[in-house]
Amino acid sequence: MELDKIIPADGPNINEVEKYINKYQSEVIVIKCGGSVLLDKKLFNQFIEDISVINKIGLSAIVVHGGGKNIKKKLDENNIETRFIKGLRVSDDKTIRYIEEALLDLNLEILNELKSKNTNVCSISPKENNVINIIPESKELGYVGTPKKINKEKILNFIKNKQIPIVVPLGLGDDGRIYNINADVAAGSIAKEIDARRLLLMTDVEGVLDENQKLISEINLNRANEMLKNNIISGGMIPKINTCLDAISNGVRGVVIVDGRKPHSILFELFSDKGAGTLIRK
């Protein structure tokens, strides 16, 4: 394999890449992508290139994408007011239709970009290859769900065929209706079900910061719990850390909160000694 023709010039060092390829050879990596990575054209193109590289060097990955900002844009265009309860978007009959539309449009855009780079990908959504069955979160939230069952067999079949599934964070309820799912939670549930080696949560921040606002490159479960208890981890980072802790407690060997604003952050996280965020493990 001619790595120098596959790894971008501004990517990680080729010697380091070789070492890490062996490490992940028979493992599965789950990558959740959201935030500005999906909106900033330059970051989006680098994300597409990173996923394409993973496929070309023969590693197995699953991508779950968010789309909160795309959803907001779609709702604003249609004059629909967004309400949140405990950080979750209230999704009534009308809202869920636009949420589905925004997420499926984004999914198609990601697929088309990856296919243009000869990447072997497939779409996973309730309309096509559904793999997530949900339980409704609460009556007041409407069509918002939590994963109840993940179709592991279907996902592993795609991986066996050397495809990278691109997952829309939507699932089906027992009522046959489509429900919106928090993308971090969807990625965490899939990672647990398939015993992923790594779960990468791409964000718009550097990683987990200590009390002096300095980046922590690695923490264990106990320290993360302590930081939550002492409010060192706060705000939007709390649900992300809870997803990380849940995944690690259920078989995922390591979860990384990745700074998605860094060039080729996925490649640097997986294939360099330095990484690109905060690694959390037992």
Predicted regions and their residues:
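Nucleotide/pyrophosphate-binding catalytic subdomain
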Residues: 1-261, 274, 281-282
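Membrane-helix cytosolic exit motif
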Residues: 253, 266-267
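Charged catalytic cores and adjacent phosphate/nucleic-acid-binding surfaces used
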Residues: 267, 276-278
